[in-house]
Each structure stands twice: as C-alpha cells, then as structure tokens.
C-alpha cells in the first residue's frame, strides 16, 4: 500500500539514547546490503518468499546510491555500531512525467527502504533515523515524502502511521495470479 506524508519542519526531538545518524558512503556498502537483505528476511515471513539472490539484486542499486556525491542513504548508529538504514531518493514530479502520473507536481522525498537490524526493533532507532531523514529530505527541497509498504507487515503499518503517513493511493495484488480464477 503506497503511503504519502506531508513534510513539515520537525520540532527538535529528544535523542533516543546515544543514537547518531550519518549519511552513508561507499565504505558502508556491505553493511547496507546486509541490512537491506534483513528487510526481505522479515517480509518473507509475512508476504512473498525471499529470493536466494536478494543481496545480488539489491547490491548494485545500493552501490550506485552510495557512490553519489550526496547519497540519500542514512545510517543510525549506537556506540559505533550500525543499527538501522534508510535508503531514499528525491523525485521531481511534473505534469506529463512518469512521476507526474502518480504524484502531484513538486519535489518529493521517496523513502525506498528503511530497516532496523533484527534484535534492535522497537528500540527507537527507526524513529530517530526517520526524524533525521525527514529533516534532510526537507533541506534537499522535498515538500512531501512518499513510500510503499507491505500491509501484511505488522510492524510497518504501525510505524509509518505513527510517522504521519496516510494513503495516497491503494493497489491490491493476489499471488499467484491463478488464484483469481
């Protein structure tokens, strides 16, 4: 279910324990891929099964994102250990453009993948990370943000609602397609 969020300047929040958030770089590729794969390990339990080559599929896109001058990838750390990742992008929507078919005109922040390391979920890392990421997307010119999430994931539906996201549009699918018969 795609969700959208109107981006407003965030009030300064209290830091969750000693969480620090930083922009990721090329040296973080292996850790970023490992965290991104952890998303699919979890959603594979509640949605479509995870593919054995998930890391191979995600690696090149993360490499390209991390090689950008200012990657839209952030990491939350505690005591120097990476606990969470947010892989995002900026999307410019204009009438007649591909993005314009789905989004109102303007500069959008796209939240592609957010994951907290297994065993760390519920510890405030995702909340601290996204507070920082929303501010950074706003500074980068985004006036709104959007994301897609899997409604069968019981963690994401609660998390994103608490982050202020509301439905922009809804799409449904059935797997396998033969189940429609």
What does each model-identified segment do?
Residues 1-16, 169-177:
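Acyl-donor-binding surface of acyltransferase catalytic domains
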Residues 20-34:
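A short beta-loop-alpha structural element at the N-terminal edge
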Residues 43-61:
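Conserved GNAT-fold acetyl-CoA-binding loop/helix
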Residues 1, 127, 151-169:
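Conserved active-site alpha-helix within GNAT-family acetyltransferase domains
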Residues 113-116, 122-135, 162:
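Conserved acetyl-CoA-binding loop-helix of GNAT-fold acetyltransferases
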Residues 117-128, 140, 152-157:
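Conserved glycine-rich acetyl-CoA-binding loop
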Residues 146-156, 173-178:
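Conserved beta-strand-loop-alpha-helix junction that forms the acyl-donor binding cleft
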Residues 1, 137-149:
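Conserved GNAT acetyl-CoA-binding A-motif
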């Amino acid at each position: 279910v795609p969700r959208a969020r109107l981006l407003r300047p965030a009030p300064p929040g209290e830091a969750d324990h000693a969480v620090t958030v930083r922009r990721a770089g090329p040296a973080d590729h292996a850790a970023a891929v490992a965290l991104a794969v952890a998303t699919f390990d979890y959603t594979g339990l509640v949605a479509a099964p995870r593919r054995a080559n998930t890391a191979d599929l995600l690696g090149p896109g993360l490499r390209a994102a991390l090689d950008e001058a200012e990657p839209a990838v952030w990491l939350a750390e505690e005591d120097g250990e990476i606990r969470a990742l947010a892989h995002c992008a900026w999307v410019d929507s204009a009438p007649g453009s591909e993005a314009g078919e789905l989004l109102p005109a303007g500069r959008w922040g796209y939240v592609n993948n957010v994951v907290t390391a297994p065993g760390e979920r519920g510890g405030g890392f995702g909340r601290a990370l996204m507070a920082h990421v929303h501010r950074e997307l706003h500074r980068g010119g985004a006036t709104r943000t959007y994301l897609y999430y899997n409604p069968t994931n019981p963690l994401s539906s609660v998390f994103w609602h608490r982050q202020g996201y509301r439905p922009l549009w809804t799409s449904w699918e059935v797997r396998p397609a033969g189940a429609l018969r």
